[in-house]
Amino acid sequence: RYNRDYLRLNSYLLREDHKRADEMFDLLLGLNLPKMQRVDLVIKAFNYYVGQEDRKKSKELLHEIKGFEGGQAEAVAHECQLMYDTMILKRHNDIPELERMLKEAGDDKVKSCRLEYLLALQYKNKGDEAKFQEFLEKSGQHSMAVNA
């Protein structure tokens, strides 16, 4: 049942059917799932609700993400916090840290793409249109390289 509903969720997300996607997230998040499925679903829901600028649901999911343990849990929680601060709280005080993280990302195009996008948004929040456009373009170039 979970796999079928998860596929249905992905279909709603692809079609941008937000009403049904919300309903499916509510259903799936209410299930008692194995740890790895729960982690995957919570992160997917967090990314969705941050993109929808849903402050309440994003905050609840971020709180759960911060409780994850093992593996890359701490790094994932930190990156989710940066996303929340940037996209929900509209902050721009993480620019130096994001630039440092971008340098450390090296040849990791997926990570670079994500960090450049967050940097673009932080510069937008700051009101620096030129830097916003610069990092948005870089993010787009890495995105095309990743999807090629």
Show which residues each predicted segment covers:
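Generic helix N-cap/helix-start motif at coil->alpha-helix transitions
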Residues: R1-Y6, P34-I43, G70-Q81, D108-E116, ...
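Soluble extracytoplasmic domains of inner/organellar membrane proteins
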Residues: E74-K90, P96-L98
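N-terminal topogenic membrane-targeting module
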Residues: R1-R38, L61
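Alpha-helical repeat scaffolds
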Residues: H18-G30, D54-E69, R91-G106, D128-G140
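Heptad-repeat amphipathic alpha-helical coiled-coil interaction surface used
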Residues: R8, A45, L102, L119-A120, ...
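Long, hydrophobic alpha-helical segments that serve as membrane-spanning/inserting helices
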Residues: Y117, L121, K126-A148
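A membrane-cytosol interface segment of integral membrane proteins
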Residues: R38-R55, K59
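Residue-level signature for tetratricopeptide repeat
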Residues: S11-L14, N47-Y48, Y84-I88, Q122
